């Protein structure tokens, strides 16, 4: 007679089904013994000490696998561990070993709350600044962002770009020692500087938030797409109109580069959580916030079978971050055109609820995209992700310019763009600018606008809920449905005038 295994060693809900699935594209796989990235949420019951729970989990890991097993867990936040495990190893871990005893399972379940997939996330101004009335606000209220610090969780920021030199955007004493690289390196200790940007996305986003074109315009080269006679796009150079400048929305704000995207524009949920935890740690060192807001111009499709909208580990960590007084701005995603349905007659129908994570986070300010200077005419960008969330909440919260936005260019973003290629006779520090599109750029406009607002309405620092409500209440209605435009187009001038 075959012995019946003891009941209870595995709770059905403790392991995400997605973790055990084969061939899931948005989970990191090493190719080594079918190991995949998992995010283990530790069980922190009331009264439990996080350090003691972490030590208990590491002892469990060693007892189950020994010293020659899978790679050691990596702490990414006080109650999250990043692990690389095979499906069999995951099962063994939550059972407390190979024997599958009730005692072993109870030990494991006393330490592990849930095993989540470590999802892969990807990266999603001269005329657009006036669209949100940032230029008028600077003239009227002197809202240039001075004294405000914003963290950019992205592919890094190229500190060598002249755009960030005039106002010490990255080198002021308030931020000089705060930059960090959280990207995963195959060789520990060989991480790249957070003030370099091979991918180029982070520098472009950062340039929309803060910084300013150098006064010496002889070093300025701006590339934009100009249709040819055959209606094909071609990169050409353009000049600034007389009296115009290229500036971030909050030119005098300071930025903290938290590099989370690798050179291909990818990152992991665990990496994001690690960076978010770092912001909390920085802000816990003293009475006043050192980092006032964060910008996340990235995201990924999320599996609704795994958790309700806004309840993923990453979304929950962002909600916790806003609870500490930090304003969180997130791009809605560029999936608005990816969910089209074709009817029997060949007609195409749009599909709603395409907001990507972490744009589903309830307390985050989630931003969609509109045309850079004619938003009333063209409305919401066709591929800007639409609401509502799948649990019925309205998203996005706001829209901002996101089409063909000119900002600082570097790395892969300008590679192959002939007009920006180095040439004989160029000064050594040419300021190169280029157009890019997406809700990544829209989120950066909102981050810059809020940084500008906080620089003159300092009583709102540390009040993310009040700031979100104020900007939504003061937004300009574009006459589109709230699932497309949210509260409307951000209006910095009206937000300042209403307080």
What are these regions (language model features)?
Residues 43-44, 117-119, 152-156, 209-212, ...:
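Active-site-proximal beta-strand/loop segments in catalytic clefts of secreted hydrolases
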Residues 96-99, 103-109, 138-147, 197, ...:
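Mature extracellular/periplasmic domains of secretome proteins
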Residues 129-132, 138, 164-165, 272, ...:
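Active-site-adjacent substrate-recognition loops and nearby beta-strands
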Residues 206-209, 260-262, 292-294, 402-483:
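Hydrolase catalytic cores
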Residues 488-499:
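Catalytic cores of secreted or luminal carbohydrate-active enzymes
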């Amino acid at each position: 007679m075959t012995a019946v295994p003891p009941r209870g060693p595995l709770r059905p809900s403790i392991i995400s089904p997605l973790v055990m699935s084969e061939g899931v594209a948005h989970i990191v796989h090493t190719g080594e013994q079918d190991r995949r990235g998992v995010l283990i949420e530790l069980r922190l019951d009331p009264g439990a000490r996080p350090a003691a729970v972490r030590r208990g989990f590491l002892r469990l890991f060693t007892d189950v696998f020994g010293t020659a097993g899978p790679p050691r867990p990596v702490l990414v936040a006080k109650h999250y561990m990043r692990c690389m495990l095979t499906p069999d190893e995951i099962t063994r871990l939550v059972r407390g070993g190979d024997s599958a005893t009730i005692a072993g399972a109870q030990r494991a379940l006393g330490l592990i709350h849930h095993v989540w997939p470590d999802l892969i996330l990807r990266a999603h101004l001269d005329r657009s600044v006036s669209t949100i009335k940032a230029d008028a606000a600077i003239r009227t209220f002197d809202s240039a962002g001075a004294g405000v610090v914003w963290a950019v969780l992205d592919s890094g920021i190229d500190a060598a770009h002249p755009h960030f030199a005039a106002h010490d955007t990255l080198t002021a004493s308030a931020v000089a020692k705060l930059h960090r690289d959280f990207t995963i390196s195959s060789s520990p200790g060989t991480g790249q500087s957070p003030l370099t940007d091979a991918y180029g996305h982070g520098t472009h986003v950062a340039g929309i938030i803060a910084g300013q074109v150098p006064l010496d315009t002889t070093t300025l080269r701006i590339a934009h797409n100009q249709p040819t006679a055959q209606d094909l796009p071609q990169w050409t150079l353009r000049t600034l109109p007389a009296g115009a400048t290229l500036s971030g929305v909050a030119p005098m704000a300071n930025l903290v580069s938290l590099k989370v995207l690798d050179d291909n524009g990818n990152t992991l949920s665990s990496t994001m959580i690690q960076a978010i935890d770092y912001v909390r740690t920085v802000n816990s060192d003293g009475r006043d916030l050192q980092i006032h807001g964060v910008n996340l111009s990235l995201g990924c499709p999320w599996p609704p079978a795994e958790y309700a909208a806004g309840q993923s580990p990453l979304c929950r960590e962002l909600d916790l971050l806003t609870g500490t007084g930090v304003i969180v701005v997130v791009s809605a995603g560029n999936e608005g055109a990816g969910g089209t349905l074709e009817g029997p007659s060949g007609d195409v129908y749009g599909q709603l609820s395409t907001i990507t994570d972490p744009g589903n986070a309830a307390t985050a300010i989630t931003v969609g995209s509109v045309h850079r200077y004619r938003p009333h005419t063209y409305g919401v960008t066709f591929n800007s992700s639409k609401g509502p969330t799948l649990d019925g909440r309205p998203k996005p919260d706001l829209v901002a310019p996101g089409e063909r936005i000119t900002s600082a260019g570097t790395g892969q973003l300008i590679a192959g763009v002939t007009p920006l290629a180095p040439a004989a006779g160029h000064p050594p520090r040419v300021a190169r600018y280029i157009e890019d599109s997406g809700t990544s750029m829209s989120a950066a406009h909102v981050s810059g606008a809020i940084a500008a607002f906080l620089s003159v309405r300092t009583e709102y620092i540390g009040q993310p809920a009040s700031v979100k409500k104020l900007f939504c209440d003061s937004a300009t209605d574009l006459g589109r449905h709230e699932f497309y435009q949210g509260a409307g187009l951000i209006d910095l001038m009206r937000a300042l005038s209403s307080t």
